Amino acid sequence: MHGLAPLEADVEVAGRTDPAIMRDLVTAAGGADVDARWPEVAEAAIAAYEQLAPDDLSERVAPGIVELLEALAERPAEFRLALLTGNLEPIARLKLARAAIGHYFEPEQGGYGSDHHDRAELPAIARERAGGWPRERTVVIGDTPRDIACARADDVRVAAVATGLFSVEQLADADAVVDDARALLPVLHSWHSWGQSPLGTRRGSQRRPKPQT
C-alpha cells in the first residue's frame, strides 16, 4: 500500500509495539508517511494477520501459562487478569482466541499497541481501564527485557518467564524470574499479601528481595 519494494529489514521486534515495528519497517523500505497514513497501515496489518495466522495457535502457548491463568481466574477476589501487549488490539484478541485463552481476559480491559506506540505507557493505561487499579497490587508478567522496562516505567512489580526467547540471566532485572509459568503462583500469592500492607514498590523505596526461582 506504500508502493515500496519488499525487503528483509533488520528491525527488532521482541517486546515492542506493532506501531513502532511498522514505522521502522516502512522507514527502512524508504517510506516517510507512515504516521499520516497510520489508519490504513493498521487496517492492512490486521487484515494480513487474519489471513496469514494459523487457525490453531494453542501449541504456541508457553508451558504453564494455561495452568497459571486457570489458577488465577479461580481467585477473582484476589487477582484480576488484564492483557498487556504491544499488538494492535484486534490482532491481540485474534491471537488469544486462536490460542484458546481469550476467555481469561475481559473485553475493554488491558493495554495494547493500539493505545500507544510506546510500551512504557501501557501499564498505566491498563490500570486506568481497571478503575484506577493501584500500583502496589499490579504485576506485569512478561518474557522480554522490554516487559521489565515497561513495568519499571509505571513503578509496578514485574515477573519474568524465560519462555526461550530470552534466558533467565537476560531477565534478571525482574523482581522474580522463573522458567515455567506455574512457578509464579506462589510468588504472586506472596506479593498479594504484601500488597495489603503499607509496604510498596514505589520509586525510592527499598525493593523486596527476589523470591527464589
Protein language model regions, located:
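Short acidic-hydrophobic, aromatic-tinged amphipathic segments that line or gate anion-handling sites
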Residues: 111, 176-181
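Conserved phosphoryl-transfer catalytic core
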Residues: 1-30, 48-49
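Acidic, Mg2+-coordinating phosphoryl-transfer loop and its flanking beta/alpha structural elements
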Residues: 140-178
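Substrate-recognition "cap/lid" segment bordering the active-site pocket of phosphatases
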Residues: 59, 82, 87-139, 145-154
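Short amphipathic alpha-helix with an adjacent loop that forms part of the alpha/beta core around
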Residues: 185-197
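Compositionally biased, intrinsically disordered low-complexity segments enriched in Pro/Arg/Gln/His
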Residues: 196-202, 209-211
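Glycine-rich phosphate-binding loop signature in dinucleotide/nucleotide-binding domains
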Residues: 74-79, 130-136, 191-194
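Short, acidic loop-to-helix structural element flanking the phosphoryl-transfer center
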Residues: 51-83
